[in-house]
C-alpha cells in the first residue's frame, strides 16, 4: 500500500529544493542526512520549520528533501519555499495562512554582477585627488 505524498519545489538564490511530504511523525531528512546534522545553524532550522508551524503540521509529516546549489542560507530558504508549496498541494486552505506570512513568495533577490571598472558590484576604486 503506497502512502500518499505531496511534492513541492522551492528556490532561493542559486539553490533548488525538492520536497516530499508523507504522513508520519515529524522526521525530516535532507539529502539522506538528519536536518539538524545538515543545517547546523539554529536560524536555518527556524526558517525551515516556519511553514509547518504556521499551519500547525509540525509533527504530522515526514519530510524528505533533496537540495542542490548555493550555500546554507539559500538552501534553507529553498527548503522553506518547497515545504510551503507542498503544504498547499496537501490542503488548499493553507494557502491564505502561508501567503499572509509571505512563505509562498519566491525571494527574487540574487547576487548582483560585478561591473567593469569597479572593484565589486558597486564598490568603486579609491579616488585620489592628487
Curated annotation (Swiss-Prot):
Record key words, sorted = Ribonucleoprotein, Ribosomal protein
One CC-aspect GO term: cytosolic small ribosomal subunit
Kindly give the Pfam families that the UniProt entry links to this protein: Ribosomal_S9 (PF00380)
GO molecular function terms attached to this record: RNA binding; structural constituent of ribosome
Statement: the UniProt record of this protein carries the keyword 4Fe-4S: no
Q: Which NCBIfam families match?
A: PRK00132.1
Q: Which family does it belong to?
A: Belongs to the universal ribosomal protein uS9 family.
The protein's name in its UniProt record: Small ribosomal subunit protein uS9
Amino acid at each position: 500500500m503506497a502512502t500518499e505524498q505531496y511534492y513541492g519545489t522551492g528556490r532561493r538564490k542559486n539553490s533548488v529544493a525538492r520536497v516530499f511530504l508523507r504522513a508520519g511523525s515529524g522526521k525530516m531528512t535532507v539529502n539522506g542526512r538528519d536536518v539538524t546534522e545538515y543545517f547546523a545553524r539554529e536560524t536555518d532550522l527556524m526558517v525551515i520549520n516556519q511553514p509547518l508551524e504556521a499551519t500547525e503540521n509540525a509533527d504530522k509529516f515526514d519530510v524528505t528533501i533533496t537540495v542542490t546549489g548555493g550555500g546554507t542560507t539559500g538552501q534553507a530558504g529553498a527548503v522553506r519555499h518547497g515545504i510551503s508549496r507542498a503544504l498547499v498541494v496537501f490542503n488548499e486552505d493553507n494557502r491564505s495562512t502561508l501567503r499572509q506570512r509571505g512563505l509562498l513568495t519566491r525571494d527574487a533577490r540574487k547576487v548582483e554582477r560585478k561591473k567593469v571598472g569597479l572593484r565589486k558590484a558597486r564598490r568603486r576604486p579609491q579616488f585620489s585627488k592628487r
